[in-house]
Amino acid sequence: MGRTLAEKVWDAHVVRRADGEPDLLYIDLHLVHEVTSPQAFEALRLAGRPVRRPDLTLATEDHNVPTTDTLLPIADPVSRAQVEALRKNCADFGVRLFPMNDPDQGIVHVVGPQLGLSEPGMTIVCGDSHTSTHGAFGALAFGIGTSQVEHVLATQTLPQRRPKTMAVTVQGELPAGVTAKDLILAVIARIGTGGGAGYVIEYRGEAVRGLSMEGRMTVCNMSIEAGARAGMIAPDETTFEYLRGRPNAPTGADWDAAVEYWRTLATDPDATFDHEVVIDGPSLSPYVTWGTNPGQAAPLSSPVPDPAAYADPAARGSVERALAYMDLVPGTPLSDVAVDTVFIGSCTNGRISDLRDAADVLRGRQVADGLRVLVVPGSMAVKAEAEAEGLDEVFRAAGADWRSAGCSMCLGMNPDTLRPGERSASTSNRNFEGRQGPGGRTHLVSPAVAAATAVTGRLTAPADL
């Protein structure tokens, strides 16, 4: 019987299997940052254990780092302590670290791919929900907790129960102006924030194949927002061309052998998925979230939903609570909703193509009066590339604030936050209550919509400028 992509990668990494027990998986790449690793390293230290494979472990500072004044000490004592702990732990255990201001520093899920560390057929873990980003390469990548971080550091293995498989097929081509971010928001709105629970989602279809690698990373990044364990896309020529020549990618005969193997990482024609979802690509349009979870999303051209339209009492109550927090009135056109802040960045949309999309919209235009716009590259390498292309000048000329690399306003763990009652259009991945700061209200959008919103001061599709 045929196997899915996820099943092939899983089976290739099982080092121990026993009835009634989780499979023991070998881990090819372990990514580490300052927030979920201190307790794990300390547990190793207390037990007198080394890191099993420091050569397969990479750390970077991203969550807590400021994106301005990066040459000064970190002001917040908790953030400073976590960053200092990571530096000491990496030095003590021989783990490679990209600290603030290092040319390779950045958000962990941006750094791995740009260095060619994320490759098809790998197992990749990190103490971070959005590790599924790396599934865009045909890797099985998922987030883990701090105790699991310790287990991987100590053994390079992880006990896991085999997940179910789901296919999300996006048929046809995406219309002009519709991006990977719109696609994944539409998927989550369709299946819900729990629709992927217990599954590894494989994204398929013409629309998915038409995405760039960076677009594919955006899609896989938000798989966790549908409740999925991971998201994957089978590798193809787009994947190979992205990886070719990157610092840690194979070369010469090793490259040829790798590509030959990578070509086998496709779901077999006779394989079956546990669940399948089909979405019509040509019918999609720019999406925006209106509520307090990523599944509460709709086309930007639609109105704020009416709770009365929901027959299920639980769903109706959820919508009522979300609208109360977001301070939105049912029936209001989403395109009339004004914002105070625009954030362009994060591991979802902080790559060079995202910045190019935003710059294309802002070029020759001005940010609306009184609006705060933060543009934060996902890594120092992305920052350097954007500056070499003059994108920073486009953003500054428009009135946006060009920052250094980091997670920034994606989450309220660093100086870049919303004030209570402020509303943002954000290219990040979560719009939970208080996610960007206590009392902050978040609308998730694509970089292009974020840039158009920056011009008008209200949620706007670029086509409407």
Curated annotation (Swiss-Prot):
Protein keywords: 4Fe-4S, Amino-acid biosynthesis, Branched-chain amino acid biosynthesis, Iron, Iron-sulfur, Leucine biosynthesis, Lyase, Metal-binding
The segments labelled Disordered in the record are 416-443
Which residues are recorded as binding [4Fe-4S] cluster?
C347, C407, C410
- Domain of life, per UniProt, equals Bacteria
Enumerate the catalysed reactions.
Answer: (2R,3S)-3-isopropylmalate = (2S)-2-isopropylmalate
Cross-referenced InterPro entries, in alphabetical order? 3-IsopropMal_deHydase_lsu (IPR004430), Acnase/IPM_dHydase_lsu_aba_1/3 (IPR015931), Acoase/IPM_deHydtase_lsu_aba (IPR001030), Aconitase_4Fe-4S_BS (IPR018136), Aconitase_4Fe-4S_dom (IPR036008), IPM_dehydratase_rel_enz (IPR050067), IPMI_cat (IPR033941)
Its needed co-factors are: [4Fe-4S] cluster
GO molecular function per UniProt? 3-isopropylmalate dehydratase activity; 4 iron, 4 sulfur cluster binding; metal ion binding
What family does the entry list?
Belongs to the aconitase/IPM isomerase family. LeuC type 1 subfamily.
This protein's assembly is summarised as: Heterodimer of LeuC and LeuD.
The name this protein goes by in its record: 3-isopropylmalate dehydratase large subunit
Q: Can you name the source organism?
A: Parafrankia sp. (strain EAN1pec)
Q: What is the lineage of its organism?
A: Bacteria, Bacillati, Actinomycetota, Actinomycetes, Frankiales
